[in-house]
Amino acid sequence: MSPGERFLDWLKRLQGQKAWTAARAAFRRSLAFPPGAYPRAMPYVEPFLAKGDWRQEEREAHYLVAALYALKDGDHQVGRTLARALWEKAQGSASVEKRFLALLEADRDQIAFRLRQAVALVEGGIDFARLLDDLLRWFSPERHVQARWAREYYGAGASEEEKKKEVEA
């Protein structure tokens, strides 16, 4: 089980408790602060983080994903990456593509803002476990995550055309 899947399980358990209403409000409010800096969100994330040895940027990624999960009311769709969801939204919209490219270029100071914009833009849920797993590797010098996201985004149209041809055949 990946770190993202473990954290998503944690969030789903929290979502099933009475505390979810307060947690969801705290997570949503936390989007106005740097990830991990809003004290009211800490009681809902720190117990999970205490179980591991996380670097600061990894801690921030957990807080950011929790906030984005709350923003989407826990609408998790396994396998639907943010890149794919943005491609679906971008049909006929150059501005969505520009936002996607800005997201791919986001540094540590910009990532929370860019991700919040992107997640709010798409309709329906995304794979939050995969999002966290990707964020945990986002700042790697090789930029493998950003390259994969670009392939998923720009390759989505090609895969849609292939599916249509298979159905027609």
Swiss-Prot record:
CDD domains: Cse2_I-E (cd09670). Keywords: Antiviral defense, Plasmid. GO terms for biological process: defense response to virus. It holds the Pfam family CRISPR_Cse2. InterPro entries: CRISPR-assoc_prot_Cse2, Cse2_sf. The keyword Transferase does not apply. Belongs to the CRISPR-associated CasB/Cse2 family. NCBIfam families: casB_cse2. Homodimer. CRISPR (clustered regularly interspaced short palindromic repeat), is an adaptive immune system that provides protection against mobile genetic elements (viruses, transposable elements and conjugative plasmids). CRISPR clusters contain sequences complementary to antecedent mobile elements and target invading nucleic acids. CRISPR clusters are transcribed and processed into CRISPR RNA (crRNA). This is CRISPR-associated protein Cse2. The gene is cse2.
